[in-house]
Amino acid sequence: MSRQLNIDALRQNFWKEEYLREKMLRCEWYRKYGSMVKAKQKAKAAARLPLKLPTLHPKAPLSPPPAPKSAPSKVPSPVPEAPFQSEMYPVPPITRALLYEGISHDFQGRYRYLNTRKLDMPETRYLFPITTSFTYGWQLGPPVKQELVSCKMCRIESFFRKNGAFALLDPRDLAL
């Protein structure tokens, strides 16, 4: 639809009235519903603000009642904490040093570190015993390539129609 450029006084007055009427409708709507919209916006904004919890001051520790000094009691020895044990053996220092040499963008740093860690066998990296996923996935060895054996005539005989349908396309496509 092309734009009409022939605008006369009648059409210009029509558009002026239409514009003023829409403007008045917007003002009336804002006067009626503006306060409700602002209230909803404030409620949503308040819901989006993070909840501030009151600060709790530490309570003063209560002093324990004085113990009678007639008999010295045995103080239990502190329970030894179990050392933190990760799933993997610690990284050798030579391999760890690769982290700090260069950046990954230049195939150094973290990139070289991860590649050298990947070269280690999982059995030498992990502390826990071999699971079924170790046996199935990591002990299969390299994949064996199988060459596809196919002959052209097998494809032609099995793919193309033998009843002559669409024979007009290419006479070589017809397998008789």
UniProtKB/Swiss-Prot annotation:
<feature type="region of interest" description="Disordered">
    <location>
        <begin position="55"/>
        <end position="80"/>
    </location>
</feature>
<dbReference type="InterPro" id="IPR054323">
    <property type="entry name" value="SPMIP1_C"/>
</dbReference>
<feature type="compositionally biased region" description="Pro residues">
    <location>
        <begin position="61"/>
        <end position="80"/>
    </location>
</feature>
<protein>
    <recommendedName>
        <fullName>Protein SPMIP1</fullName>
    </recommendedName>
</protein>
<dbReference type="Pfam" id="PF22589">
    <property type="entry name" value="SPMIP1"/>
</dbReference>
